């Protein structure tokens, strides 16, 4: 089956992918902001780590947008919720970013359920790969705390 052929639950899948695009784009802003707010002896490696996370997150948004267009949909120009707590302690930043990654896992799990219901192996594998990546990000942040 071609990805542009009508899939069961296609509209729901495109909607969920757009939620993912918006979530990931908010992550780009979040991680870039965090990189600005790091001070102290560990600044150089931590700034690089957050900027790398921003780049990875932009890649996730791009992949979701490509999936949307492969399905004949239109990617959102929106951006997800941006939370500014004004807490820039490293532990607070790690906790906030871990919560962000957990939300990402939930979105990709919801997409996986829709993909399984639609019978699209491509979407299933995409969802599983991103769930694994996001879960590894959560584990990395848990280890840092």
Protein language model features and the residues they cover:
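Iron-associated oxidoreductase/ferritin-like identity signal
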Residues: 1-145
């Amino acid at each position: 089956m071609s990805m542009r052929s009508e899939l069961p639950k296609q509209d729901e899948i495109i909607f969920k992918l757009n939620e993912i695009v918006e979530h990931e784009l908010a992550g780009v802003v979040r991680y870039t902001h965090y990189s600005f707010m790091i001070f102290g002896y560990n600044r150089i490696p931590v700034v690089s780590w957050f900027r790398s996370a921003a780049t990875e997150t932009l890649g996730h948004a791009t992949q979701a947008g490509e999936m949307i267009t492969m399905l004949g949909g239109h990617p959102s120009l929106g951006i997800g919720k941006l939370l500014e707590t004004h807490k820039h302690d490293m532990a607070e930043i790690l906790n906030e970013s871990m919560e962000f990654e957990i939300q990402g896992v939930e979105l990709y799990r919801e997409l996986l359920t829709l993909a399984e219901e639609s019978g699209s192996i491509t979407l299933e594998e995409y969802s599983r790969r991103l769930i694994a990546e996001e879960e590894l990000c959560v584990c990395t942040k848990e280890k840092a705390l």
